[in-house]
């Protein structure tokens, strides 16, 4: 089954005139077979086994299970070694989960531009450098100057979304940089984009990387805004939707 969509045709926010969600084009259904390494997977598409690019270098072990229904975007570049990108998984008992690690930043950019985070009109700059740091988004207006770091969340168990799915020293570094921004007089936000619907809350993945959870607690105490939002996920699109409770208490020993 093939879905043909156009990236340019995005729904507009009536108030702000900005795109509210990210769309893919030329979506194809397949069945996951195996993942030889972090970058590629073997997927059965229309009866043929294809080597496809995995748009997420995380472990994703709970998602990429043999026989699982997946959705892929066909590349428009004929020179590529792989013709498809694996972007979405239909997890048993959960439904569709977008696993594209690039889309949270893009979706967050459009979502903030559309006026969903701040009440006033803001100017949003992606990939903004400040000192020795580079943040996903920089927001400025007459009322505020803020840095936003975006993290995509694909790990879920028992209706709880968790991050990270593997130890992330880079993630710890980003949190410490947000704390530094607060100390310099800026607003600072960690925006957790949960790439699925229906979770009850977000928690740090204490068992996988305790230091990240502890640094997240430190960031909250320093005044960093920790926000989590779920997403409506369809084979051809992902839309940031509703706030999700954030629980930073540690019950893991």
Q: For each of these PLM feature ranges, what is it?
A:
Residues 37-42:
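Short aromatic-glycine-enriched beta-strand elements
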Residues 49-62:
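Beta-strand/loop nucleic-acid-binding surfaces
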Residues 3-6, 11-12, 196-253:
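Domain-level recognition of nuclease-like catalytic cores that cleave nucleotide substrates
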Residues 30, 135-165, 178:
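Conserved catalytic cores of phosphodiester-cleaving nucleases, focusing on short active-site segments
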Residues 80-93:
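OB-fold/S1-family single-stranded nucleic acid-binding modules
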Residues 159-169, 179-208, 230:
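Nucleic-acid nuclease catalytic cores
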Residues 116-130:
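A short acidic/basic microdomain associated with nuclease active sites
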Residues 68-77, 230:
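Flexible glycine-rich surface loops and low-complexity tracts that mediate binding to linear polymers
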């Amino acid at each position: 089954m093939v879905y043909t969509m156009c990236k340019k045709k995005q729904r507009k926010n009536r108030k702000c005139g900005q795109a509210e969600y990210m769309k893919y084009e030329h979506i194809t259904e397949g069945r996951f077979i195996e993942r030889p390494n972090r970058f590629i997977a073997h997927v059965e598409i229309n009866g043929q086994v294809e080597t496809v690019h995995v748009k997420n270098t995380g472990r994703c072990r709970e998602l990429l299970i043999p026989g699982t229904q997946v959705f892929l975007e066909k590349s428009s570049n004929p020179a590529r070694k792989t013709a498809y990108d694996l972007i979405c998984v239909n997890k048993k008992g959960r439904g569709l989960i977008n696993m594209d690690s690039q889309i949270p930043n893009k979706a967050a950019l459009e979502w903030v531009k559309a006026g969903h985070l701040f009440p006033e009109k803001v100017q949003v700059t992606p990939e903004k450098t400040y000192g020795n740091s580079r943040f996903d988004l920089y927001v400025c207006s007459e009322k505020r100057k803020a840095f936003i770091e975006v993290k995509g969340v694909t790990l879920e168990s028992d209706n709880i979304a968790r991050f990270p799915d593997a130890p992330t020293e880079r993630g710890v570094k980003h949190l410490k940089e947000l704390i530094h921004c607060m100390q310099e007089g800026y607003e600072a936000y960690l925006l957790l984009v949960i790439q699925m619907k229906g979770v009850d809350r977000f928690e740090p993945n204490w068992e996988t990387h305790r230091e990240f959870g502890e640094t997240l607690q430190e960031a909250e105490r320093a005044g960093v805004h920790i926000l989590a939002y779920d997403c409506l996920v369809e084979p051809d699109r992902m839309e940031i939707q509703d706030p999700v409770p954030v629980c930073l208490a540690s019950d893991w020993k």
